[in-house]
Amino acid sequence: MASMRKAIELNPKNSAALNYLGYTWAEMGVQLEEAEELIQRALKIQPNDGFYIDSLGWVYYQKGDYPRAVEQLERAVELTVDDPTIIEHLADAYEKAGRPDRALLRYREAVKRSKESDQIKRIREKIQRLEKKI
């Protein structure tokens, strides 16, 4: 993380470093305000980057702002289409936003697109848990 901070210090317009640090904090659920600010800065440089938009959506998810998370993550999925992690993020947000049917559809799509056994296992567990609720 220190190396990312240094990269940003040396080049404040390094959108990849801004997003990387912001997403890392979002994934950890820490420093969410600063994470959002870093990702917003990255998006000013590359406004249509689906991965950066996913990062912003994930910050909103971690903050518990599920409607905004869904809005950003739907946009991220439109821009990246095949990324199973972004699709899983959208499914997670749908579930928290009280839209379990949409969550299930997206979880199933993420399983089809994923090539990582750990991710597939995790998502299948989410599907099973959600199917029991519905």
Positions of predicted regions on the chain:
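Structural signature of tandem alpha-helical TPR/SEL1-like repeats
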Residues: 1-6, 28-41, 63-75, 98-109
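Amphipathic alpha-helical repeat scaffolds of TPR domains
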Residues: 15-24
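Canonical tetratricopeptide repeat
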Residues: 20, 55, 89, 123-126
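TPR alpha-solenoid repeat register
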Residues: 17, 52, 86, 120-123
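Register position in tetratricopeptide repeats
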Residues: 27-28, 62, 96, 126-133
